[in-house]
């Protein structure tokens, strides 16, 4: 059984090397390191990378929902889309791929569809909040947009997948409590 504490995840990340048999392992590990930083800062353990056609990182972000009080839009994907839309990245959206450590939520996926980013890859499934696995639940106009973007699971090794899953689950009960305290439920 793997250690799912912050210290355990730090050790697991440090001892996990990218497996060359898995196309996304190297960038997925970079993404997981960012997600770990988000956890250490008291945020959800989620991060995202924007990759060019050569799979080089052109921008990166981590979840910052609780970094400065509360910002519901400070998901990693949203931060990167903001940078892209401000023109600060200098890349055509259609040529980019977003690699996310956790399946995007409905808010992020809707924004991704409108961004023009060519492809979205995610490392870990989000059975409670992920939207890519529920694409058919979108209204018809949104389903048309879905056809303009590629969506798929990242090609990662089992150790990298488990790290991403454990990061996404890190301190989840406490984070949900903070969220509900903020929204008054």
How would you label these PLM feature ranges?
Residues 59-60, 76-91:
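Glycine/small-residue-rich phosphate/adenosyl-binding loop
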Residues 65-79:
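A short, polar/charged loop-to-alpha-helix boundary motif
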Residues 40-46:
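A short helix-loop-beta-strand connector motif used in the catalytic cores of GNAT acetyltransferases and
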Residues 41, 53-54:
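Short, ordered coil/turn segments that flank beta-strands lining enzyme active or ligand-binding pockets
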Residues 90-102:
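Immediate flanking context of iron-sulfur cluster ligation sites
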Residues 1-38, 104, 111-185:
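Zinc-dependent deaminase
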Residues 46-52:
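Short beta-strand scaffold segments in enzyme catalytic cores
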Residues 56-65:
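Short beta->alpha transition motifs characteristic of CBS
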């Amino acid at each position: 059984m793997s250690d799912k504490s912050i210290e355990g995840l730090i050790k697991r990340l440090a001892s996990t090397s990218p497996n060359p048999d898995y196309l996304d392992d190297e960038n997925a590990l970079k993404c997981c390191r960012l997600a770990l930083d988000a956890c250490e800062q008291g945020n959800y353990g989620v991060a995202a990378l924007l990759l060019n056609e050569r799979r080089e990182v052109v921008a990166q972000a981590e979840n910052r929902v609780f970094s400065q009080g509360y910002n519901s839009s400070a998901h990693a994907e949203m931060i990167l889309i903001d940078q892209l839309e401000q023109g600060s990245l200098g890349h055509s959206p259609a040529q980019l791929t977003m690699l996310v450590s956790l399946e995007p939520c409905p808010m992020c996926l809707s924004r991704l569809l409108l961004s023009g980013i060519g492809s979205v890859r995610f490392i870990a499934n989000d059975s409670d909040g992920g939207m890519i696995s529920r694409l058919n639940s979108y209204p018809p106009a949104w389903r048309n947009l879905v056809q303009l973007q590629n969506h798929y699971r990242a090609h990662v090794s089992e150790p990298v997948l488990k790290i991403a899953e454990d990061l996404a689950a890190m301190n989840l009960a406490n984070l949900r409590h903070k969220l509900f305290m903020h929204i008054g439920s």
